[in-house]
Amino acid sequence: MAMTAASVFGSGGCLELLTSSKAMRGKLWTRLAPFISKRHASTSQTSLSSSSSSCSVINPWLFVGLGNPGEKYQCTRHNVGFDMIDMFAQSQGISLTRHPFKALFGEGMVEGVPVLLAKPQTYMNLSGESVGPLAAYYKLPLNRVLVAFDDMDLPCGVLRLQPKGGYGRHNGSVDFIIMCFNEVIC
């Protein structure tokens, strides 16, 4: 199989991923688990108290795979974000269905952590039209959103997770950032 490069943007920075096959993309959770577990412990619980009991509500993670809808773009490097979400959803038994916010969407639990998966059905450069309102609806701060997209600047054959960085001049992630700040979700 051809090598595929991708970036996963989130938590105030950029996580860059490179995967060599669809099977490896299916193991996305394994690669992200240490990062998410660390962030999960410090930022993900909201305490609810009442006179008789208290409980914690675990805030979900939103994983977004950027790509372009339509057969014309299937199996192209530009849709690696879609491929990553598809493989992750399949490996975790999460079904994706149409969502009112212009996305294919799924919800599930992975190792006790709630996850939301989204594939915006807008063109990539307009992905913020889907992701911004979706994150706002679920009241997710930006540090609970990870966005996977192709990255032509990444060399093939390298895997790098980086909690801080930029968006790699990627218009889809720029649109996402602008929409999120306009929705005041951070």
From Swiss-Prot:
One of its GO terms (cellular component) is chloroplast. It is found in: Plastid, Chloroplast. Residues 1-49 form a transit peptide. InterPro entries: Pept_tRNA_hydro (IPR001328), Pept_tRNA_hydro_CS (IPR018171), Pept_tRNA_hydro_sf (IPR036416). Its main location: plastid. The keyword Transit peptide applies. PROSITE patterns: PEPT_TRNA_HYDROL_1. The record marks 150 as: Stabilizes the basic form of H active site to accept a proton. The active site is at 78 (proton acceptor). Belongs to the PTH family. This is CRS2-like protein, chloroplastic. It comes from Oryza sativa subsp. japonica (Rice).
